[in-house]
């Protein structure tokens, strides 16, 4: 985003039910906004899997190190899942925001609401809806084909969708490219908001001297 005024980054939070397009859209956004947007990298205590790189896929730490990060307020939020800790490092997020780089979070509604409660000033939240439950069912069938799995995910999807009203924006994903375009428009608009233009006062002062 070329601009003579410096802007703070945002925390771009994207949620959708399984099959809604969140993962694909997130990958495309990172590719198309690569100078302005980075993927959130979590801290975890689990062992690295083959091919995973520390600092790219996760920040890998020991459990005592993780607990120390929590006790010293260096984690925005965290949880224990299947015996391993996962969390969002505060410094990674705040440093990027201060440098004008936005951070993308592709997370469920529970994680989204935690970030909204903690960092409301910086969060821009978007919920992605499927065009219809029939279309969502078709997408899930193409993934799995197992009726039990599909029915379970459709039930979960209805519950997840019921939380969309708290998001800043809601997009209906008829077409991936159109959805990416809409989110990029939101991204640009949010970055241009007055409260995020950190060099605005200096710019105005120079203009009216």
Swiss-Prot record:
EC number: 2.7.4.8
CDD domains linked to this entry: GMPK (cd00071)
Record carries keyword RNA-binding: no
Alphabetized PROSITE patterns for the sequence: GUANYLATE_KINASE_1, GUANYLATE_KINASE_2
Name of the top EC class for this enzyme: transferase
Tagged with keyword Hydrolase: no
Subcellular location: Cytoplasm
Organism whose genome encodes this protein: Ehrlichia chaffeensis (strain ATCC CRL-10679 / Arkansas)
GO cellular component entries: cytosol
Binding sites annotated in the UniProt record for ATP: 16-23
Gene3D superfamilies: Guanylate Kinase phosphate binding domain, P-loop containing nucleotide triphosphate hydrolases
A Pfam short name: Guanylate_kin
NCBIfam families for the chain: guanyl_kin
UniProt KW keywords: ATP-binding, Cytoplasm, Kinase, Nucleotide-binding, Transferase
GO terms of molecular function: ATP binding; guanylate kinase activity
Function summary: Essential for recycling GMP and indirectly, cGMP.
Protein name: Guanylate kinase
PANTHER family: GUANYLATE KINASE, GUANYLATE KINASE-RELATED
Highest taxon above the source species: Bacteria
InterPro entries referenced in this protein's UniProt entry, alphabetically: GK/Ca_channel_bsu, Guanylate_kin-like_dom, Guanylate_kinase, Guanylate_kinase_CS, P-loop_NTPase
Catalytic activity: GMP + ATP = GDP + ADP
Domain Guanylate kinase-like positions: 9-188
Family in the record: Belongs to the guanylate kinase family.
